[in-house]
């Protein structure tokens, strides 16, 4: 891009601005040193105005700079509007009325349009200031880019230093582990402790039948603690309230644990027949538990029964007793 042409007006304007600032802030005063340093950095020079833009710089400025247009600068109508607003003449008025008031203000020379030469000169000054600002932006962005490029190099150096420190720490940890393993091996090589000698008299009474029965009873109670019938049965056995005839029978655990009758391998003896005859609460008659390998009860009426003389008869039926000897 071509450089900006410097007119005589712009050159004179910049020289006048520099002279005014230096006259106001004397170099002899040490307090004005910072102000003069800032003025020297921000002062518009001919070299700045002659500096051309590259395509990349123009593209970066267009992408990163917001463009604003000031429509109120050197506008006589804007000045008339400010005067009418101060008096409240435009409150609740139509747009047609407002336009007539603008024309009236210009016609009566309340405000006058700015000369074209004056507007061109002011635009030239604004363009020079804008270019100085753009140059400052480009220099700042270039400095940031260089810092970002140098940041990865510094970070890689830090990573290398950190990796070296980690390797040293790992070596220290491995040395400590080797020392610990050596100590553990030396401890394992020590003689084992002597076990106490147990005599035969100390083992007397271990494994007796009474202990085995108690152990089996405790295991049975532990396995069937969830069953309420089993718990009730165990409580009756421990309290001694259960008849001896039932506790000595092999069918007691089967009936109370699984809800079944006597097993087929068990035959009641003559001493147990009186205990086996239990009155049925519904018919108030004697009820037989097991006869001829079948479940026989008055309430269920299943299968035949054998009386005390050895005759077979059917429950709830009018049939005569059956002679076992004749059947043989």
Swiss-Prot record:
Keywords: Chromosome, DNA-binding, Nucleus, Repeat, Telomere. Residues 107-320 are annotated as: Required for binding to Su(var)205. GO terms for molecular function: telomeric DNA binding. GO terms for cellular component: chromosome, centromeric region; nucleus; telomere cap complex. A motif (Su(var)205-binding Pro-containing repeat 2) lies at residues 281-287. Multiple telomeric associations (TAs) in the same metaphase spread often result in multicentric linear chromosomes that resemble little 'trains' of chromosomes, hence the name 'caravaggio', an Italian train. This is Telomere-binding protein cav. It comes from Drosophila erecta (Fruit fly).
């Amino acid at each position: 891009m071509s450089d900006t042409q410097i007119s005589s007006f712009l050159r004179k304007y910049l020289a006048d601005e520099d002279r005014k600032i230096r006259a106001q802030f004397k170099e002899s005063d040490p307090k004005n040193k910072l102000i003069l340093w800032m003025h020297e950095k921000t002062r518009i020079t001919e070299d700045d105005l002659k500096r051309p833009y590259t395509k990349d710089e123009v593209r970066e400025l267009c992408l990163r700079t917001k463009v604003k247009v000031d429509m109120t600068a050197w506008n006589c109508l804007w000045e008339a509007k400010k005067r009418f607003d101060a008096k409240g003449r435009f409150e609740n008025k139509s747009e047609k009325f407002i336009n007539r008031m603008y024309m009236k203000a210009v016609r009566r020379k309340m405000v006058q349009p700015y000369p074209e030469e004056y507007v061109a000169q002011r635009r030239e000054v604004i363009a020079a200031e804008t270019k100085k600002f753009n140059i400052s932006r480009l220099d700042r962005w270039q400095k940031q880019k260089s810092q970002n490029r140098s940041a990865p190099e510094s970070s890689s150096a830090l990573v290398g230093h950190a990796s070296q420190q980690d390797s040293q720490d790992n070596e220290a940890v491995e040395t400590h582990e080797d020392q610990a393993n050596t100590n553990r091996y030396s401890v394992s090589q020590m003689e084992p402790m002597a076990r106490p000698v147990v005599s035969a008299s100390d083992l007397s009474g271990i494994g007796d039948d009474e202990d085995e029965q108690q152990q089996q009873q405790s295991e049975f109670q532990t396995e069937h603690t969830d069953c309420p019938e089993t718990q009730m049965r165990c409580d009756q056995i421990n309290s001694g309230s259960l008849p001896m005839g039932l506790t000595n029978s092999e069918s007691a655990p089967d009936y109370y644990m699984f809800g079944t009758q006597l097993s087929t391998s068990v035959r009641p003896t003559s001493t147990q027949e009186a205990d086996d005859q239990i009155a049925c609460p519904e018919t108030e008659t004697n009820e037989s538990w097991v006869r001829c390998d079948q479940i026989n009860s008055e309430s269920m009426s299943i299968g035949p029964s054998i009386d005390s003389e050895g005759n077979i008869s059917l429950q709830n039926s009018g049939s005569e007793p059956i002679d076992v000897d004749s059947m043989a």
